[in-house]
Amino acid sequence: MHLILVRHAKAAPGQPDALRPLTTSGHLKAIELGELLARKQPAAIVSSPLLRARETAAAIARVAGLEPVVDERLAPGATAEGLKKAVAGLGDTVVTVGHQPDCSEIVLALAGREVEFPTGGFAEVEL
């Protein structure tokens, strides 16, 4: 499986953590990500339940012609094992949208390499 881990785009401060929406620049970045990642023909997009991740996933999904799936296993504190269970059987290429430091820790666990994840950043891993 080709796995594309995305960190949510830039979110606005001043809200309870789970309810922080994307900023205007965050929405634009999410659309840009969608245009880039749609070329990789993902079979599914799986998101953390937090609003900023769901909004990022929705923007990517719109461009890719998909409906995002929300999975609690991608919420803050996500693990490589939980992520593997969340994407099992979803297709050859899957995009996940999550949080830091989880994204970096998952790439390290799955691929043995350290990756920086700015907001709206992504990394690709083969499972």
Predicted feature locations:
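Short phosphate-coordinating micro-motif centered on Lys-Gly-acidic
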Residues: G121-L127
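A glycine-rich beta-strand to alpha-helix segment
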Residues: D92-A109
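Active-site-proximal alpha-helix that buttresses catalytic centers in soluble enzyme cores
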Residues: H2-A80, G91, C103, R113-G120
